[in-house]
């Protein structure tokens, strides 16, 4: 399957663009949280305070069985993910952490978020999970660790992320070479003036 994900630049735009509307802001925060944890929408809906723990070094993490695979995901928390958590319910285990409606109800807000940041194609919630996998692969995190964080039942699923980033890296390198070529020819003409 072709995993669709957002670029780092698109992620930075989403991070730096707080929304004027409460529902849109909730959608934005949930999307960012998923980009930083790899949790699917349904898993974020099911996230309760007891899924959040702290290790001996004081590092917070999420430990949750994924609804789709029933496989445990173990995710050390990024500081921005911790910041988002602090805005929601991390105390009352009777309630989920995030007050999320069903996924289809937030479809419009996620789409709108894509429009606001100027994304060329439709932004979908699932791209956030794929982006998490892609960001980790790009950061040279071992595939076994990524599989554990994403709650994949098979390492082969995780390897799909490695394939797309290889393709993307090749394309990006081609673009870079093309730009360099243009710059070097452009510089020569400037120097002769």
Predicted regions and their residues:
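Conserved tyrosine-mediated DNA breakage-rejoining catalytic core shared by Y-recombinases
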Residues: 1, 10-13, 37, 46-84
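Basic, Lys/Arg- and aromatic-enriched nucleic-acid-binding interface segment
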Residues: 1-41
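Catalytic-site neighborhood detector that most strongly recognizes the C-terminal catalytic loop/helix
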Residues: 5, 66-70, 82, 103, ...
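Short basic/aromatic active-site micro-motif
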Residues: 26-28, 100-104, 120-140
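C-terminal catalytic core of tyrosine-transesterase DNA break-rejoin enzymes
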Residues: 32, 36, 42-43, 112, ...
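Short, polar N-cap/turn motifs at the start of nucleic acid-interacting alpha helices
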Residues: 51-58, 120-121, 141-160, 171, ...
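Active-site/catalytic core of tyrosine-dependent DNA strand-transfer enzymes
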Residues: 78-120
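C-terminal secondary-structure termini that scaffold catalytic or DNA-interacting sites
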Residues: 176-193
